[in-house]
Amino acid sequence: MRVLMFGWEFPPHIAGGLGTACYGMTRGLARNDVDVTFVVPHAYGDEDQRFTHVLNASDVEALYGSTGSGADDILEKMSFIHIDSNMVPYISPEEYEQYQERYVKSGQKVWSTTDAWKQRYTFSGKYGANLMEEVARYAVVAVQVAKNLEGQFDVIHAHDWLTYYAGIAAKRVSGKPLVVHMHATEYDRSGENVNTQVYAIERAGMHAADRVIAVSNLTRNIVINRYGVPADKVVTVHNAVRFAAGQCKMPERGVDDKIVTFLGRITYQKGPDYFVEAAAKVLKKVPNVRFVMAGSGDMMNHVIRRVARLGIADRFHFTGFLRGEDVHKMFQLSDVYVMPSVSEPFGISPLEAMRSNVPVIISKQSGVAEVLDYAVKVDYWDVDALADAIYGLIQYPALAGMFVSKGLEEVTNLKWNDAAAKIKTVYEAVIKENKKQ
């Protein structure tokens, strides 16, 4: 079986759990005799390609404009005006006419999608101000990729909203079935204040797909209830964790204090403010504890100011974003790992912490809570319960030891090979259905 897979990041160049999940998944699929071509906007050349072929979208020469391809209506929805500003190039037809008239009068060139020309796009593969433009151009390249690989894949698999338009376009031009993977919804990222553009892309992708894979039942329910996707079309496949050699080397600790770690994006979804409030409560009882916030995000300055106001800055450490070996080192230095997410579709980090013999505290509002018994679970908003859980794990070694030993047994059974086998059955089902049409 051959899969054309569209992603936005791939290790070692990642911004979060999405790339890590994609890597584990492709390894698992390879062991289930599935051949994966993994397309990314920007490949660096140092990606591990032992289990998958990584295709760099920036190397693909695509036909842009009125091509009769599967991406034309996507381009119509996402028109681009090249001006020196931070404006996100995702506007309505009416707004486009207004901007076009204004810039034509000014004598500046406005590109129109009614003309076709060949072009090779240079993608950043990041999450910058021109993200929507890159999403649309990725769909244009996806058409060309599908044409170039005609007859070389049986199914298309697209990860998260960034690649959904690419998946739709590839499906239209190839006629192959489409599976979209929902790793995190816009409701997870933004609460009720959703970005309507992102929501529209998510909804379009899931309704165009033959199957939707959700990373948890929590996410599955959101997909069904918030996006109107038929329940029989949505399948839950939980994520897993990869065990690699050489993860047992203990770095020098340097301090005798207990270390409690938060590792993730410092943004609303991850609940960093609840971690800070709980830390302040713990420090009133046990002063010899250090709290580490490993990550970056839009709430960083807010969190730093709150730590200062609470008078606990001398007990707090901000490492910035960590990746690869630094993540493993951070876990090995930790006595407790905390994931207080407001809404977490799954959450691979607790599995990585448990793999490193660290007891974990997770929010009940997380997908990973569905597969873990030996993790302390609290409501994200219950700061008192979170503080009590941290206190218990650092003050009672026998309790922490039980969670470590039982947790390691539990997480050892969460294998990517098993998750990939479930994904393969989804592929087989949509391929069979597609042949009947």
Where are these regions (language model features)?
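A conserved catalytic-core segment of Leloir-type glycosyltransferases
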Residues: 37-146
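Conserved donor-binding/catalytic core segment of Leloir-type glycosyltransferases
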Residues: 213, 254-279, 404
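Carbohydrate-associated surface elements
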Residues: 218, 240
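Short hydrophobic beta-strand element within catalytic cores of glycosyltransferases
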Residues: 359-362
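Short alpha-helical donor nucleotide-sugar binding micro-motif in glycosyltransferases
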Residues: 321-322, 329-334
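Aromatic "clamp/platform" in nucleotide-sugar-dependent glycosyltransferases that forms part
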Residues: 342
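Nucleotide-activated donor-binding/catalytic signature segment of Leloir-type glycosyltransferases, i.e.
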Residues: 302-322
